[in-house]
Structures are given as C-alpha cells and as structure tokens.
C-alpha cells in the first residue's frame, strides 16, 4: 500500500469511556476528508460513581460498538468491501475496552480480507491536525487529556520525541479530581471551567507548579492539595466559594502550563529548529480558557496555533481512522496476533526525568 492512491479507513476507538467509529478518506496528495464520525459517550453510566469504572466501560463498549460501526459505515456510504484498512486503538487505555475495539477490528479485517492497523491512541491525537489542517512536519504537540499531559516533537508518522511530561496528575485528571472534591457533577472538567467563569481567580494564592524550571515537565499534585486545603478551611462551601476555588485553580494551571510550554518550545527549537506549528490535542484542549492561553503562547514565539474542533480533541474514531490511514500510506500494517496494551509510550525512547523514575513520568 502506497500513498499514491486514495485510502478509505474505518477507525474504532474504545480506550476509555467513549465508544466511537469513523470513516476517513486519505487522498493521494496526503489531504484528508472525514466521511463519518459517530461517538457514543458513557457519561450516564459512570456519573453515579463520579468517574470511569473500567468494568462498566468495557461492558458498555460490547453493548453498542456494533451499532456504532454500522452507523459510521452507513453515514459514510461505504461498504466493508471498499475499505482499504481497518484501524483500532490498541492502547494505551483501559485494557477491557481496548480488547473490545481491537478484537472487533480484527474480526472485520479477517472477514473482509482487509489490512489491520493497530493504532497508538496518543499517536492518533498527535496526527489529528494533519486531518483537520494539513499541518506539515515537524510540529510541537501539546497533548492534554484525562490520562496524559505531554509536550512532544512530532517529526513524522511514527517519529516522536517527548520533550516534557507530567510527573503526577494529567491536566484532565486534575480538573476531574477538583470537581469531585468540590461536589461538582461528572464529567468534572467542563464543570470546573464553567464555575471558574463566575469566580475570582485572585481570591486564593495557589502555587504555580514547576514555574521557571529549565525542563518542560508538569506537576499538578501540589496544586490539587492546595485547593483541598483551602476548601477544608471553608467547609461548608457556598456556591461562590466553589466558583472562586475553581477560578483560582484554573488560573494556576494556565500560568503553569504557559510556562511549561514556553520551555518545551525552546527545547524544540534547540533540537529541531522552529516548529511549523504549536498543536494542541486531547480533551483538555477543548477548554476555552486553555485555548486562549495557547493563542498567547503561540503569539509570543511567533508560531501558528492549530487546535482541532472540540469534537476532534476529545476521544473519537476519526483520529484513529486518520492515524491508520497515515500508517497505511507508508505500508505499515499489523498482524492478527497484535496484543492490546494498557500502556504504550508514544516516544519509545522516552525515559523518566531525573528524580522522577518512580512516578508517572516513567511511562
């Protein structure tokens, strides 16, 4: 399979709490077209528990995935026999869900004699801007989601260098934990963002983690503890207390992330020259305050900011299909014995920063 022909790829995403499928076309010139994108969120199933329950997530994927795939194929007007490839997120993620999606993709590929592409979920986020904006390599990726916060040099398909990572909580995870701590509904990230809009960001003097460091790593656990301590002093919390705590927390995150991105962009330029763009991906990139901060960071270093539409920042099948198409165009396919992976580094050579070997930064 070469890039000199158009490719139609079905993508399947089941790594967490969205069941999704999509069909994309990758044209011979490398441009892309989204033919369908069906996403079914499991928010209602997990809301009573205040977070994602892996067993419930896996069972929900089993219940609806066939219908989601059928809807995606129908909307695209594509028959299975016309597909150039079938792509599925093979990790990282909740292993039960990953198994559901990857096994389904294998079955489709076997029945129709279609190539299988096992996609790294993080690579799919990294390559999405090439579908939406045709961005050229190399670019600097800020990946911010519930499970990951990284700064990555995207040098080509399958060629990634991690410049910075969180040593504890991911940004989306921290937002969700703050929401739960303050009694806000699940999913917590949008609730914190909404409350922050009505709050005073200057009422509380929260720390700005990792500010001024030469590396490009993140840390949010200390900030989370500071919010918990202030909330404990005010219990019971009234609505304005909650708004102000959220505003102060979000302001601290924004300042810290802006500083860390500045360091990451400096490291990128030192190693690879100026990036073609600063790209943001992952669910946290749907936060409008984060988007405003990203525009300021990009303007400061005189680079272009590219952020996919919110529906393509959160988990979706289109990003899996597109990553599959990009890999298929290079002749990269996978065998039927490809294993699902709970952990899967985007940069296979990444190592934990000094003093953080036993933290999340080691993954």
UniProtKB/Swiss-Prot annotation:
Cofactor(s), by name: Fe(2+)
Signal peptide extent: none
Compartments, as annotated in UniProt: Cytoplasm
Binding-site list for substrate: 143-147, 176, 189, 287
Protein name: tRNA N6-adenosine threonylcarbamoyltransferase
Keywords, ordered alphabetically: Acyltransferase, Cytoplasm, Iron, Metal-binding, Transferase, tRNA processing
GO molecular function annotations of the record: iron ion binding; N(6)-L-threonylcarbamoyladenine synthase activity
Domain of life where this protein originates: Bacteria
Single GO biological process annotation from the record: tRNA threonylcarbamoyladenosine modification
Residue numbers binding Fe cation: 121, 125, 315
Pfam families reported for this sequence: TsaD (PF00814)
Function: Required for the formation of a threonylcarbamoyl group on adenosine at position 37 (t(6)A37) in tRNAs that read codons beginning with adenine. Is involved in the transfer of the threonylcarbamoyl moiety of threonylcarbamoyl-AMP (TC-AMP) to the N6 group of A37, together with TsaE and TsaB. TsaD likely plays a direct catalytic role in this reaction.
Family that this chain belongs to: Belongs to the KAE1 / TsaD family.
Catalytic activity: L-threonylcarbamoyladenylate + adenosine(37) in tRNA = N(6)-L-threonylcarbamoyladenosine(37) in tRNA + AMP + H(+)
Keyword NAD: no
GO cellular component, one term: cytoplasm
Cofactor note as given: Binds 1 Fe(2+) ion per subunit.
InterPro entries assigned to the protein according to its UniProt record, in alphabetical order: ATPase_NBD, Gcp-like_dom, KAE1/TsaD, Peptidase_M22_CS, TsaD
Enzyme Commission code: 2.3.1.234
Entry-linked CDD domains: ASKHA_NBD_TsaD_bac
């Amino acid at each position: 399979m070469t890039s000199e022909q158009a490719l139609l790829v079905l993508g399947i995403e089941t790594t967490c709490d969205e069941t999704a499928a999509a069909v994309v076309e990758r044209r011979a010139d490398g441009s892309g077209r989204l033919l369908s994108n069906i996403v079914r969120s499991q928010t209602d199933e997990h809301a009573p528990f205040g977070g994602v329950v892996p067993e419930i997530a896996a069972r929900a994927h089993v219940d609806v995935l066939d219908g989601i795939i059928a809807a995606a194929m129908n909307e695209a007007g594509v028959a299975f026999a016309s597909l150039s490839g079938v792509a599925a997120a093979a990790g990282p993620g909740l292993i039960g869900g990953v198994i559901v999606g990857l096994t389904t993709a294998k079955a489709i590929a076997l029945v129709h004699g279609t190539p299988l592409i096992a996609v790294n979920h993080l690579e799919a986020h990294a390559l999405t801007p090439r579908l939406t904006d045709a961005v050229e390599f190399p670019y600097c990726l800020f990946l911010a989601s519930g499970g990951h916060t990284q700064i990555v040099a995207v040098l080509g398909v399958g060629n990634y260098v991690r410049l910075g990572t969180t040593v504890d909580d991911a940004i989306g995870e921290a937002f969700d934990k703050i929401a739960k701590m303050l009694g806000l509904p699940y999913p917590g990230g949008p609730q914190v963002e909404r409350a922050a809009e009505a709050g005073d960001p200057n009422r509380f003097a929260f720390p700005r983690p990792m500010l001024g460091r030469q590396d490009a790593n993140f840390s949010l656990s200390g900030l989370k503890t500071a919010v918990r301590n202030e909330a404990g002093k005010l219990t019971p919390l009234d609505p304005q207390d909650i708004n102000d705590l959220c505003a102060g927390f979000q302001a601290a995150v924004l300042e810290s992330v802006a500083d860390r991105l500045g360091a990451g962009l400096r490291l990128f330029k030192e190693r690879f020259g100026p990036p073609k763009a600063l790209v943001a991906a992952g669910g946290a990139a749907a936060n409008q305050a984060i988007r405003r901060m990203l525009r300021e960071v990009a303007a400061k270093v005189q680079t272009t900011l590219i952020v996919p539409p919110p529906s393509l920042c959160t988990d979706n099948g289109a990003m899996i299909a597109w990553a599959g198409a990009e890999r298929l165009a290079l002749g990269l396919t996978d065998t039927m014995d490809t294993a699902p992976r709970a952990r899967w580094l985007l940069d296979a050579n990444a190592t934990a920063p000094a003093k953080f070997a036993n933290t999340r930064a080691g993954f």
